Amino acid sequence: MRHAQVRVPTAPRGLMLAVLASMVLASSAPVSHASFEELEPSVVCSTIDELQFNGTHANASISWQVGLGPRIPGSNASAEFRATITADLESLGYEVSNKTHERYGMELTNLFARWPSDSTSNGQLVLSAHYDSRNVADQDENESNQSLPVPGANDAASGVAVLLELARHIPHMNLDYDVVLFFNDAEDQQPKYTLGAEAWAENLTGDEINTTHAFVLLDMVGDADLQLHDIAPGNATLKSRVVELGTSLGLVNGTTSCNGEAGLDVLQYETTVYVLDDHVHAHNLGIPAIDLMDTSFGVPKPYTFGSYWHTMEDTPDKVSAQSLAKVGRLVELGLRTDAFVNINPSSDTTGEEDTSSVEQPEEGESEAYPNQNTGLAVMASVGLVSILGLLVVVEVRGKR
């Protein structure tokens, strides 16, 4: 699957979003969070003191993962990664299993670590990150590097690092539902994408779908300049709760944290970015899903997710323990306050149901990039998603 993003930012001065149709694409606007059930602020604030996530400990995992070498499906590094975390997670009491699939001539292996709950009837929450690193650095400015495998410190290891650190603390949270840590494979192998998550979704039973509270994806969450955008498609209630949690932790600009501190500009949910990522497969099954992702890794660069993305510059020094801590504490707070369970699937943002079927531009086709300074806008045709013929001025970037 080709990854792509269609970003609809809050319009800068001079930039007009033109709609040339008789109907408005509801999902093109930032999600409104006001109409959804809110968390109890006093409960959230009192829970912050219980948080145990250690960003420094998580960051140590980044160097270890990259040190294994390219974690390409079927490689020795991939197998060593699974063997090591299997031993570590089993020592903590997790039930660990692997499932191998054959896709497009590629053997991929998904790894699952389940923490059994105190109850057997309250369903499961899936926390996921891809552990494979990209097989080619095709966005590297140095042409001699473009055939080399990417180190994958941020785009691979960062999400895994957060899950592994959370794994240390989940057994002590006394949750009344199961937590499944899903380390998915073959998310980022040129020319195919999200194959591990796709295989997982295709093999779920109806009962497993119905008893899954939510699917929370962590992707590219270690950038020192952390900027988490509203990723579409996704569940609006989950997004609303993430903003509430982030506000309490001081991650939302213009707000005040539970500690009375001014919020940082980390959760930027006024900007919606369309990304065909692993979470789409859960979303399309009706499982409430959210993608926690930084879509700007390094210096902004047209048609990409930043100057370090899919290059040999995706190295451990670009990843910040502080950023990992911000994301890890956000997810931990959500776990401890039950923010990710008992979500209404019908609250998915209108118009996002079939985002994965939008035709993406083939490599080599021309794309325009809106310059924020000049207000240049791009007219992109959005087809096959129940709004045939609707044209919206948007920014189009391909994740290739």
Descriptions of predicted regions:
Residues M1-S46, T349-R400:
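Secretory targeting signatures
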Residues F36-R82, L92, K301-K318:
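N-terminal capping segment at the start of a domain
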Residues I48, S61-T120, N259-D265:
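A non-catalytic alpha/beta surface segment that caps or lines the substrate-entry region
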Residues H57-G67, N76, E80-S91, V96, ...:
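Extracytoplasmic/secreted proteins, especially bacterial periplasmic and envelope-associated proteins
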Residues W64, F112, Q124-S128, G152, ...:
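Structural recognition of the beta-strand scaffold that forms the well-ordered cores
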Residues R71-P73, E102-G105, D118-T120, Y131-N135, ...:
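Solvent-exposed loop/turn segments at secondary-structure junctions
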Residues S147-V243:
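Acidic/histidine-rich catalytic neighborhood of metal-dependent amide-processing enzymes
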Residues A214, A224-E362:
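Active-site-adjacent substrate-binding region
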